[in-house]
């Protein structure tokens, strides 16, 4: 008798990861709607999206480390390279650019010319400029913190036309993280 494996029995690294763009946009718009609802009770929309992203980042760290069969990174450049290449490709189907700040040894940036998170969301004008890329900033912060690289992560988006968004994920590591790396 030929038994095929159920989806639960398949290895994690063999399951196809594709999600349709329409399903993603509906799910993400519902997340934004939920944050809009919470904002009416005095909670900032970006903070709500960032908090949701934190939870995703923690879980994504465990999953991608196992899936890609890589050792956990022990220095800042390696973890940021992993995020800008592998994590970004897993989430958004393309890699992003990693930049180091010229002003501070604690600051790095991940730049994405056209992030999906800002593409399909129309926020009412009375809410001002809401940056939905705060969700991606939360994912990066969760990923870093679960790897013991504590940092504050924020998202900044510049609109460069109708459908073009230049998003920068700004990462500022805590001084003790940079000092720990210097001592090793």
Curated annotation (Swiss-Prot):
Classification via SUPFAM superfamilies: Ligand-binding domain in the NO signalling and Golgi transport
Gene3D superfamilies in UniProt: Trafficking protein particle complex subunit 3
Keywords: Cell membrane, Endoplasmic reticulum, ER-Golgi transport, Golgi apparatus, Host membrane, Malaria, Membrane, Transport
Location of this chain's protein in the cell: Golgi apparatus, cis-Golgi network; Endoplasmic reticulum; Cell membrane; Host membrane
One term under GO cellular component: host cell membrane
InterPro entries in the cross-refs: NO_sig/Golgi_transp_ligand-bd, TRAPP-I_su5, TRAPP_component
UniProt subunit comment: Part of the multisubunit TRAPP (transport protein particle) complex.
Protein task: May play a role in vesicular transport from endoplasmic reticulum to Golgi.
Family under the similarity heading: Belongs to the TRAPP small subunits family. BET3 subfamily.
Protein name listed in UniProt: Trafficking protein particle complex subunit 5
């Amino acid at each position: 008798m030929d038994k095929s494996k159920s989806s639960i029995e398949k290895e994690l690294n063999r399951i196809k990861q594709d999600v349709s763009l329409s399903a993603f946009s509906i799910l993400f718009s519902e997340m934004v709607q939920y944050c809009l609802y919470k904002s009416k009770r005095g909670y900032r929309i970006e903070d709500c999206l960032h908090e949701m992203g934190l939870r995703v980042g923690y879980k994504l760290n465990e999953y991608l480390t196992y899936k890609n069969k890589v050792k956990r990174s022990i220095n800042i450049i390696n973890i940021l390279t992993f995020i800008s290449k592998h994590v970004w490709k897993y989430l958004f189907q393309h890699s992003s650019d990693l930049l180091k700040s010229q002003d501070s040894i604690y600051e790095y940036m991940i730049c994405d010319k056209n992030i999906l998170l800002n593409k399909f969301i129309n926020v009412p004008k009375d809410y001002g400029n809401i940056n939905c890329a705060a969700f991606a900033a939360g994912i990066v912060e969760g990923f870093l913190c679960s790897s013991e690289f504590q940092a504050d992560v924020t998202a900044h988006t510049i609109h460069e036309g109708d459908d073009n968004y230049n998003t920068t994920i700004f990462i500022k590591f805590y001084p003790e993280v940079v000092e720990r790396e210097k001592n090793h």
